[in-house]
Amino acid sequence: MKERTYVDDVDRSVYDIKDEENDAYRIKSGLDASIVEKISKEKNDPVWMQNFRLQSLQIYNELKVPNWGPPIDGLNMDNIATYVRPNTRMTAKWSEVPEDIKNTFERLGIPQAERKSLAGVGAQYDSELVYHNVREEVAAQGVVYTDMESALKGEYADMVKKYFMKLVRPNDHKFAALHGAVWSGGSFVYVPPGVSVEIPLQSYFRLNAPGAGQFAHTLIIVDEGADLHFIEGCSAPKYNIANLHAGCVELFVKKNARLRYSTIENWSKNMYNLNTKRALVEDGGTMEWVSGSFGSHVSYLYPMTILKGDRSRMEFTGITFAGKGQNLDTGAKVVHIGKETSSFMNTRSISKDGGISTFRSSVVVNKSAENAKSAVSCQSLMLDSKSRSDTIPVMDIRTPHADIGHEAKIGRISDEAVFYLMSRGLSEEDARAMIVSGFADNVSKELPLEYAVEMNNLIQLEMKGSIG
């Protein structure tokens, strides 16, 4: 008798199509000063960035790998190429993108999404942006959406220097230092005061090269009273050797501004996803995170929000799916500094076939954060006896004038729920599928429509195998 599985694995057929390697330049594997200097020269960095990279490398060499997360013994930096330049330069015209790269993004739906519902798109292939464009009416509002290299060396150089790796500093942890040394690609966004961008901007990151790392840097500044929704998508084909994604996201939400940052990460199961994301929110500002984590062999992913301003707020909504061979360590952190700040975390995790899902929440309420409110809700669903789900909450409350709550539920599909639905005419397969679908619904409804559809495609709510 076949073992019954209630939820299929992520359907990766479109993501696992590999392009032939046609790189213009691939740096040798490993990490030392000569490699960092070559990357800096290849990118024609200003002097301050050259020095920043080398200082970050020094910090990287001094720091140890974090010992509290899942093991990453299979990741050997001696085998990782930290820079791979595709055989094209960035363009604002889709017709000028090489056919092989264009076909990859066409399969992933990037051009269609842009035509239908996006204000602008950036598409990164390996270490560089190959396409970046923003609608004329959005640019006419003064919105800046460009690649990081252009911002670093062009009109916005001073702004980049002011904000770059000021939220995520190289000495925060070893992989932040690694990012500072070898970063490449990513997007720069600036929304002027009072401007509301009615439709989202999107960046998509595709890592095609085997044995390579991707280190994109996203820097977004939403000025006073402005509003933006930014979407991030990630994928890679599967190889028999390790790949690495150690990106960095820095978000600055000014007074009374609002930023929603939505992510679907669908890395392959040979990927080590060691991404760092952080937001700083000023008076009256709102930061909203929506996160779906479905791929990678190992993930360390804990978006952090600093509620610096009075009456600033944060919401985090996330879902994690851990299948066979996956150890996904995810969560969120919030630091309350301003008065009357509020935060809410609502997460779901699904694990099957021995997959391991861990949710870490950290709530820090400083003495200055009078009348702060925070609520954390995490629910986990294990679909078999081989899987594992852990919840690790940390609360550091330094004032008596705060309202803090935490709720965690870990369980399996109950026979009673299945029996009830079957008594209403559903088959056992449909009953179990409906329960899992409802479990994920709170997150999927927060995603943009096209990403909600993608998430439902990734988690195939179907039964397979025999019954009884």
Go through the PLM ranges and name each one.
Residues K2-Y6, V10, Y25-D172, A176-A177, ...:
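N-terminal amphipathic, basic helical "cap/leader" segment at the start of enzyme domains
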Residues D16-K18, D32-E37, M395-I397:
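Short acidic (Asp/Glu) and glycine-rich catalytic loops that position anionic groups and cofactors
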Residues Y131-N133, E137-L426, A440-G468:
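Conserved beta-strand/loop scaffold segments within soluble protein domains that form the structured core
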Residues K2-D19, K28-G30, Y451-I467:
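Intrinsically disordered, low-complexity terminal tails
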